[in-house]
Swiss-Prot record:
It comes from the Archaea. GO terms for cellular component: ribonucleoprotein complex; ribosome. The gene is rpl23. Belongs to the universal ribosomal protein uL23 family. One of its GO terms (molecular function) is structural constituent of ribosome. InterPro entries: Nucleotide-bd_a/b_plait_sf, Ribosomal_uL23, Ribosomal_uL23-like, Ribosomal_uL23/eL15/eS24_sf. PANTHER family: 60S RIBOSOMAL PROTEIN L23A. HAMAP family: Ribosomal_uL23_A (MF_01369_A). This is Large ribosomal subunit protein uL23.
Amino acid sequence: MDPYAVIMKPHVTEKSMNLIDQNNELAFVVMRKSTKKDVRRAFEELFAVKVERVNTQVTPRGQKIAYIKLAKEHSAEDIAVKLGVF
């Protein structure tokens, strides 16, 4: 799958901002059909970082949100700044 098709946009909420600071974790809205492996591959390819784990959640509105935890050697804050989240 095309990485740009899998990862659609950052999911910016109060909870996701706390996850960036406390857990080195980012939240993204992803394509509904994508799997955790698809999200991991796409994120590692787009941002050149190592992903520790991916958790997904489908909201009542039908959006799929992926919570992506980065390895300790990479900073979620740096990626958030590059994306303009902060």
